[in-house]
Swiss-Prot record:
<keyword id="KW-1133">Transmembrane helix</keyword>
<dbReference type="GO" id="GO:0005886">
    <property type="term" value="C:plasma membrane"/>
</dbReference>
<feature type="signal peptide">
    <location>
        <begin position="1"/>
        <end position="22"/>
    </location>
</feature>
<keyword id="KW-0732">Signal</keyword>
<keyword id="KW-1003">Cell membrane</keyword>
<feature type="compositionally biased region" description="Basic and acidic residues">
    <location>
        <begin position="398"/>
        <end position="417"/>
    </location>
</feature>
<comment type="function">
    <text>May be an adherent factor for rickettsial adsorption to the host-cell surface and a determinant of virulence of individual rickettsial strain. It is the major outer membrane protein.</text>
</comment>
<feature type="transmembrane region" description="Helical">
    <location>
        <begin position="67"/>
        <end position="87"/>
    </location>
</feature>
<protein>
    <recommendedName>
        <fullName>56 kDa type-specific antigen</fullName>
    </recommendedName>
</protein>
<keyword id="KW-0812">Transmembrane</keyword>
<dbReference type="InterPro" id="IPR011250">
    <property type="entry name" value="OMP/PagP_b-brl"/>
</dbReference>
<dbReference type="Pfam" id="PF03249">
    <property type="entry name" value="TSA"/>
</dbReference>
<keyword id="KW-0472">Membrane</keyword>
<feature type="transmembrane region" description="Helical">
    <location>
        <begin position="470"/>
        <end position="490"/>
    </location>
</feature>
<keyword id="KW-0843">Virulence</keyword>
<dbReference type="InterPro" id="IPR004933">
    <property type="entry name" value="TSA"/>
</dbReference>
<feature type="region of interest" description="Disordered">
    <location>
        <begin position="385"/>
        <end position="417"/>
    </location>
</feature>
Amino acid sequence: MKKIMLIASAMSALSLPFSASAIELGDEGVLECGPYAKIGVVGGMVTGVESARLDPADVDCKKHLSLTTMLPFGGTLAAGMTIAPGFRAELGVMYLRNINAEVELGEGKTGSGAANAAIDTGAPIRKRFKLTPPQPTIMPISIADRDLGVDTDILAQAAVGQQQLTVEQRAEDRIAWLKNYAGIDYMVPDSQNPNARVVNPVLLNITQGAPNVNPRPRQNLNILDHDQWRYLVVGVTALSNANKPSVSSVKVLSDKITQIYSDIRQFAKIANIEVPGAPLPNSASVEQIQTKMQELNDVLEELRESFDGYLANAFANQIQLNFQIQQAQQQQQQQQQGQVTAQEAAAAAAVRALNGNEQIIQLYKDLVKLQRHAGIRKAMEKLAAQEEGDDQSQVSCNDKKQQAVAEDSKAGSSKEGKNKEVELDLSMIVAQVKLYADVVATESFSIYIGGGVGVARTYGDIDGKSVKHIGVVASGVLGVAINVADGVCVDIDGGYMHSFSKIEDKYSVNAFIANAGVRYNF
């Protein structure tokens, strides 16, 4: 009989979790089965996100600017079911705001209009136009230039006992004439050793003598020999006139200057520099050509000076084109070829002065560095938007500068020599299905672990541009549940949420999250 009573007691105890009273508390007062609702607050720290902006001081273009993230916060609302003692399933929604990140901009040129305007805010850059210096154009060689080339002399060899000059040193002026007028390099990289330079192969092993003489000797061009040099100049001159451009030299020069002005116009607007828009007339005189070249020199130098000191190792070298046609040379051209041809010769000389000009090439390289700067990119896009009609306010450059300074001052983001600019300003709504399991359970509290997966909708602004993004997230938590009353628990947990996709293909927003909530069991 006692055995029967013990068995009955055991069966009664085993059936207890499935009885109606088990929805409340078990033998130890721990909640076992039943539905519940939970509400709470959440806060955290964003991690895994970095600025998409490159550090302009990094010549390798690999280092990104530092990014300072804010502390997001929000609330949670969930409904769930205790499906078995120590196991819960939950469907919850979490709202997070203040997912902000600031990018730290480098030092600017204090007090310069370019630096102040560069901090102007606006829509992010849409498309970065490529900056490439104008390609060299081989111009026809005039008779006066031919004669000048023929008369180009060489340096005398050093006296006995002194260091002897090389062929390249003695013929330096002739080599320069070949490059400037014909685009021919006397010395070229060695195909066998890229670090070495050799005489251009087209000037070597030239067949000598009459065609009917055999064997025919071969000889390298002797650039020091005046007769050989004269024949070379005449041949190059004839070839340049046979292959001359279909348009006039004045038109070629005008197009080159127009291209340069077009490339620098956006930067000039940021620096509040006016870029001339009138091209050279086809009938431009020699004086007009000289004036146009001086105008180009002044604009480029003013632009360089405006950004001097804004970036490290950039805009340091003064621009001096030094283009000037000597009066005697001009008169000689007019006497030999007439006024129109003299204008063409002057324009051709100006084109040669721009061909491969190291100062202009360096300026373009510096502008490419400047183009990567976050503040400059934003200012350029702001100007582009205004030109397209996106911004009808027609705010002047000075007004934009004042507005930018006022906004920086109000936000407290302006520091001596450095500025912080909001790159991300986002909010997030996350819906997840989660499972929890108790690892330690007592009458008064329990320690649990959990994991979930769901969908996150992120929205807000990135660099002033409105964005919306939906992606998959997963999370894991570790927490403690405290029984504060019958059917009421306080859950405190911390965890990590991972995003499987990037916003705008640039930003992966992950977060460490702490949550505190009240769970009420029905």
